[in-house]
């Protein structure tokens, strides 16, 4: 789709835009569902300066701090979304397009909030919104996720993984002292990571993905969120470590833009036991 026009039900509010949309996707977040009374919504993002209202000016509702939702004051049709998080663009509802068949979604976003009775077979990738743990939740499910994800290391790495000594209380403390982020779906944890700010860098530990959910981009989504957090904290580098024996992990980290930055040894060992990887924050 390159350029287009759209309107509300009664035709009072209209818009036009030029160029290819920045993105096109389906959103499953609760607030978008409620504002449209639909199981999910579909949007296209258009940069400011590339669009304009051509009919009546829509009414605006501030649904939450920093969020403005535009709708027709005559027929009530939802028209568009604007938010401080996306200050450079407006999001038009795809169903308001005069030619909605031209819409070409590329992903489902906020999938962790999707309704359990929504079954879609379009093959599009799903994107989740990571959730930060406060430390007051039951850490059992997240601890089990980490233990199960790291279990394959048993008998491979020397010394044994520190996961064996990890407790729910320690994970809760990590959430309070640092940051623990999870991706879950219908209350079931799918992936998690622990972020620890260090001088000049943000350390990523306990990156884990649940069995049956590999190769779905969950680790990449968490690492992308880690970059967002690093930027917010003023830290220019992401850092991870992997045991020297786990060459598959090394290749995976390098494929995601990390480079080897050094080696370290556990206490009592006269050889390197871990490899440090780093990636600059864009």
Predicted feature descriptions by range:
Residues 1-129:
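A short Gly-Trp-Pro
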Residues 136-212, 223-225, 229, 233, ...:
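Acetyl-CoA-dependent GNAT
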Residues 213, 217:
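Glycine-rich phosphate-binding loop
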Residues 230-242:
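Conserved GNAT acetyl-CoA-binding A-motif
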């Amino acid at each position: 789709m390159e350029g287009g026009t759209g309107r509300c039900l009664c035709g009072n509010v209209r818009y036009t835009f030029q160029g290819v949309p920045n993105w096109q996707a389906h959103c499953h977040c609760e607030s978008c569902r409620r504002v449209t009374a639909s199981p999910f919504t579909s949007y296209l993002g258009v940069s400011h300066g590339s669009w304009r209202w051509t009919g009546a000016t829509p009414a605006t509702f501030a649904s939450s701090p920093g969020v403005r939702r535009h709708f027709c004051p005559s027929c009530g049709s939802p028209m568009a979304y604007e938010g401080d998080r996306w200050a450079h663009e407006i999001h038009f509802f795809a169903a308001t397009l005069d030619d909605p068949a031209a819409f070409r979604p590329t992903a489902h976003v906020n999938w962790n909030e999707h309704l359990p009775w929504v079954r879609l077979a379009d093959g599009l990738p799903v994107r989740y919104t990571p959730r930060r743990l406060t430390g007051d939740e039951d850490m059992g499910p997240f601890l089990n996720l980490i233990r199960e994800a790291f279990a394959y290391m048993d008998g491979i790495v020397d010394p044994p993984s520190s996961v064996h000594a990890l407790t729910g209380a320690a994970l809760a403390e990590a959430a309070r002292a640092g940051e623990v982020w999870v991706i879950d779906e219908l209350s079931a944890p799918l992936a998690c990571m622990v972020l620890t700010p260090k001088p000049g860098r943000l350390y990523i530990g306990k990156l884990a993905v649940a069995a049956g959910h590999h190769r779905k981009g969950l680790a990449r989504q968490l690492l992308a969120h880690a970059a967002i957090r690093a930027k917010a904290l003023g830290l220019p580098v992401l850092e991870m470590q992997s045991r020297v024996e786990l060459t598959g992990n090394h290749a995976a980290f390098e494929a995601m833009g990390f480079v080897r930055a050094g080696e370290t040894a556990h206490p009592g060992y006269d050889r390197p036991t871990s490899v440090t990887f780093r990636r600059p924050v864009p």
